[in-house]
Amino acid sequence: MPGLPTPRRLVASVNYRRTRTVEDSRMPLTEHLRELRNRVAIALLAFAIAGVVCFIFEPRIFDWLKAPYCDLPASKRFSPDGLAANDCTLYFFGILDAFTIRLKISMIAAVVVSSPVWLYQLWSFITPGLHRHERRWSLTFVGVSLVLFATGAVFAYLTLSTGLGLLLGFGGNGLVSVLDGNRYLSYVQAMLLIFGLSFEVPLLVMMLNLAGIVSTAKLRSWRRPEIFLVFVFAAVVTPSQDPFTMLALGLPMVLLYEVALIIGWLNDRRVARRGDTSPYADLDDDETSPLDFDDAPPRPAASAGPAATATSPGTANPPGTANPPGTANPVGTANPVGTGSSTPVGAGTAPVSPSTDVTHGDIT
């Protein structure tokens, strides 16, 4: 008939709906391992291809990494006789150092270039196990974390020249620094990684606040010790350990931390307006939360149909009532005298043994 779905279309619609349920999206462990193997293989393949391409363009990448050192004045760079005053050559002192430097630069660049592929594979493997709101929040936090890491790495690259100039300026009096290319590359790599990860700390604080683990009031009460610990952290983790690099890392972290406090304060106001505060939010950190078992919902009582009920052993029918069809009085009981109740004919009464006592007399 027109307007009605055909059986094939109806079955296809049902199958499409069933594939979207949680039960049908579950897979055995072997399927998960097989999917993980395939996604890891794709990520490694993308990394290998990016590594080959980056190895070809390694001289340009190395010139970009060497630019902060080349921006220093000639008085702070080692320029032996026969080289121009504006030369910024880095040196290596081992047989395999030149190849190691090129390989290290290619691998670092390959990780960055292939990051969209392996991040997508990681996201596709984790996403099926998340709910819709968890996917939304996780996607937001992943995007923000990538932006913060890239911002920290760029900020570290911009401050490399000033930090190097300050450190190499302590030479003089016949002391000239001859930079090893391998050590210089390790220094740049450590600075980019430390600044990028340090810029993620405010995001971690904001996640703890949104999860309800810590409130903004608690964080504000600890503000002075937290700022002090931030600068101590900046002084310890920076490879150069000079005051400029410490301030270059500590001040942005404090600024981002204040931004995280503002976002947490707005979240606390939203939660308080909705009335979603925890009943244990006012408890002290050392105080145990009470266990209340009175709020547990009562268990529903088991019910049975009226036709399947029968008198329990040792009881008799109420006055004026009769046994239901197909039932009999329990052994050892009888209907009360004068109640007018009787067992219907053919109701299937249970046989009475000779030793059973009956109300009308004993059967011998």
Curated annotation (Swiss-Prot):
Q: List the membrane topology term(s).
A: Multi-pass membrane protein
Alphabetical list of Pfam families matching this protein: TatC (PF00902)
The GO terms this record gives for MF are:
proton motive force dependent protein transmembrane transporter activity
**What sections of the protein cross the membrane?**
42-62, 107-127, 139-159, 160-180, 194-214, 225-245, 246-266
Gene Ontology biological-process entries: intracellular protein transmembrane transport; protein transport by the Tat complex
Extent of Acidic residues compositional bias: 282-295
Keywords on this record? Cell membrane, Membrane, Protein transport, Translocation, Transmembrane, Transmembrane helix, Transport
Renumbered to this chain, region (Disordered) spans: 277-364
Q: Which GO terms describe its cellular component?
A: TAT protein transport complex
User: Low complexity: which segments have biased composition?
Assistant: 301-320
- Keyword Cell membrane listed? The answer is yes
Where is the protein situated, by its record's location annotation? Cell membrane
Instruction: Identify its protein family.
Output: Belongs to the TatC family.
Q: What is this protein called?
A: Sec-independent protein translocase protein TatC
Q: Which organism is it from?
A: Frankia casuarinae (strain DSM 45818 / CECT 9043 / HFP020203 / CcI3)
